[in-house]
């Protein structure tokens, strides 16, 4: 589980201005290092099984999944991995705002095209970050579930796996969107983002149950919006699957402090 400092009005800011790219604005910050630690933990998953397609989702809206997915994608690109970040939250897309690009064409353009031979490169954009490409959501459709569960979507991901080292997908909250359940089952893994004092425990538990029901590999979970020892406190940890966590806390004077022990 990765822990991030509490921010005010995170969701409204994200919807209006896009996710905050702290890994670009302040790459030497503690929080940027936390995002790099998440990247490292994902890399560890490659030991037993190749992990090239991952999704970030949450139980409910406003957990911060778009911020986490964007910043982790940047750290992957900074590490030299050719990465593409896809905004597949077709209900509340934010990627175009994050990178300040047009959303007139995007994922939905590809999925609704009558020509199955439409070149994905015609709607994939450069992010301005070396090694990172982005595919915005495109116009919001009336049928997101049908589009994302289509064979066209599965084929698109398979094609992108051949072109990129990492395919990162920002998905709608799993309890709000049936398409998230369907799509995660075809990916190498899913990371669940949880926002402290916002995400209800019962909702998080149900989200995990749904992922397990669809046999979606759960790579871990990220805890967001956490107060750690006051206003200057930060924390980091990473949970493997559901029910195990460890971490370190960071502050102005104290560099490391245990926050979590093993959960049984």
Please place each PLM-identified region on the residue numbering.
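P-loop NTP-binding module
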Residues: 1-264
